[in-house]
Amino acid sequence: MSGVSIIRTLLVANSSLLAVVPAEKIMAGVIPIGTVLPAIGITSISGMPKSTIRTDEVTLWTDRVQVTVEAKSYPSQKSILALVRDAIPAKRGTVGSFYCDSISPDIEGPDIFDSEPAISAGSQDFLVRYVR
């Protein structure tokens, strides 16, 4: 869950995003049914260690992390996804208690709609490489 923790740490530290989505609505895991929108869920899609010649206690790990935005309208969902992308820069260094080798955007997911209740959802994946 370290990739998820890294992404959440960056999101809740971004004042522009927090002006639209409060920190308590930026959560690790799936957004619960009935949550007042907008909300952001952060989930781990996959992870794998990087094979290196070096064999010590430090392992470089890559997680694919998906950030899903649920909002009441399509324009709102798209603008929040843009804020999410802005809040997660290509970065190297310490984030929370983890050392990040890199964070890079990956695939943007499909737009998903539910008419009852009115929910517009979309996602953005990130590749998070960190020392585990």
Whereabouts are the PLM-identified features?
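Signature of extracytoplasmic/envelope-associated structural regions
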Residues: 52, 83-87
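Oligomerization/assembly interface segments of phage tail-like spikes and tubes
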Residues: 58-73, 77, 84, 119-130
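Sterically constrained small-residue positions within well-ordered secondary structures
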Residues: 33, 56-58, 115-117
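A generic structural signal for ordered alpha-helices
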Residues: 45, 55-58, 62, 104
